Amino acid sequence: MKKLSVFLYTLALGSAFYSCSTAKQDTPQTDYTQYVDPFIGAADNGHTFPGACRPFGMIQTSPVTGAVGWRYCSEYMYADSIIWGFTQTHLNGTGCMDLGDILVMPFTGERHRTWDAYRSSFSKTSENATPGYYTVTLDQAKVKAELTATTHAALHRYTYEQADSASILIDLQHGPAWNEKQYHSQVNSCEVNWENDSTLTGHVNNKVWVDQDYYFVMQFSHPVIDHFELPMAETEKGKRLVASFNIQPGEEVLMKVALSTTGVEGAKANMAAEVPGWDFEGIRTAAKADWNSYLSRIEVEGTDEEKTNFYTSFYHALIQPNEISDVDGRYRNAADSVVNATGGKFYSTFSLWDTYRAAHPFYTLMVPERVDGFINSLVDQAEVQDYLPIWGLWGKENFCMVANHGVSVVAEAYAKGFRGFDAERAFNAIKQTQTVSHPLKSNWENYMKYGYFPTDLTEAESVSSTLESVYDDYAAADMAKRMGKTEDAAYFARRADFYKNLFDSSTQFMRPKKSDGTWKSPFNPSQIGHAESVGGDYTEGNAWQYTWHVQHDVPGLIALFGGEEPFLNKLDSLFTLKLETTQADVTGLIGQYAHGNEPSHHVTYLYALAGRPERTQELIREIFDTQYSPKPNGLCGNDDCGQMSAWYMFSAMGFYPVNPVSGEYVFGAPQLPEFVLHLADGKTFTIKAEGLSEANKYVKSITLNGEPYTKNFISHADIVKGGTLVYQMTDKK
């Protein structure tokens, strides 16, 4: 009875503000978590993690199999056979590393060891993960470890087969790092306090990607009979502690950890609100119900493998952004001040260069109750640091990637009718972001003087910075126009045409240009650029991949090529010419097209906008067949905070937001036979692919609510009104 009550209570919480959803939505009859495999993407370049978390939660408690080097951005590789321990925070699918806070490791036997001698082998057959739950049995320790989570707290359950010196290592020096030197020097300060024989509190400040402060409270279900600190290396400031317990063989020790950015009292309040007791099964059941309350918003027909791919994508997309404010709405902002979040919740982990493309459009459609909170968080941070977040993490800015696609995310929300934020504040943040230069990422004086970022005056990524900034200018113009700001709209609309200044008609590429107006030479359109390693004028890409980065004005881009035929000929070459140089995060290749990296994600849909929708439909099927699978290596590139997953979901339904701010989803071809989207206010939108098969991959015709539909896109407004979209599939082009 208790489990049922927790299940229903959590469903209510998960659906709060998701106004009056359908009865089926409120009490899902299907356990959709059965179709989620958290191990998908946990091998090779996917960089996902298999541990326990809640939708948009602050906590992601997960195993660590490594922490040094790019392959361990999520601290886990599926092929590894040694577990270092379990940390409480993780990034999902990123190409850079941070978090990995508070490593804990249960063990038995000798307690005094070197810091790296507490690790244990494990059998893959003992490892299992579902949304909100992870378990594994540690061979040397002979401990069964189980993890579950709430929004702000992790709950661990360790069953000790042996009771000889049953202990837990608590490592506050640990965290993912680029190299061994950084691993042993990333902590700037660390304080801990044993408040009683079962409670440890503390504060850690560290720096890998951002300057991070976290406060914690850790409690144990058994009294600690002895504890001591391990010696630290010369560059280390993070403490490592060992806590021991007096238990019998087969007995359990539970441990709960709550985090806060504001202080120990904030962490204690979070724990008291979310994990007041030791009901592991209750929290686990509530976590499952929480995930079901979201996953049930889309009903999918298809094979079990297809459902696994789809619902795992749904799961990955909802791991972030993360609610890092306390239960009372307070958080530590970018100026290190503790403040109240506008709207009561502050979110971070905004991988905006990735997620503005499809993940945020997906949130506006399927998680609309969170969108205003995301926008308020972006604007709150902008008012502290004077520009919208570029890549927001733990409430701070890490300056990763180019341009500032917080502009797009804010403008898209406004264009789609979201009004739970102050539009004047939001537009002021956009205007300041796009006009006031700041270190590292924007020199608007050069941009306005030349109409592009000159390669000789820009350290790296000049072409990508121009093209990506142009899209944000378009987004700013769109919001200004909708708000009646005529002068601002005209100003940003003029800048939105700057992409034309980098098009070299002789080569038909977007090409780096110098401040004197001449093209940079020599020029190799296949040469991959990467600011942090090889430099160059492109961001994790090349001229072949970035020439198509004009999401807001495809007709204008086609005109630069001289019409649809030369445009399509060049686009054909993209998918057939072999890439000459490689980069770790430029993957999922079909010719020069790189599905494993975000600038390519809209490109297949350009065929549909240039009069050849059948080629879009062929390529979507090829990408589904070759770049996604329900396996640990089933993602061809970094999931990038759910963007790879969001592309899959949109494309599976048969459309994609080429230009997110426009609110238009360009048609491709559906890959599963039926979807039912449970929208806000009890509405449903049904998508059917009649006649879909391996051969029938082309769309013959479309109807919307029984009427013939001839547009090459469907609008966000039409979807959220509810209705039925039917594709008639055929094997004929």
Which residues does each PLM region occupy?
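Bacterial Sec-dependent N-terminal signal peptides
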Residues: 1-27
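Accessory carbohydrate-recognition regions in carbohydrate-active enzymes
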Residues: 25-360, 364-408, 414-467, 478-501, ...
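Short acidic, glycine-rich surface-loop motifs adjacent to enzyme active sites
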Residues: 475
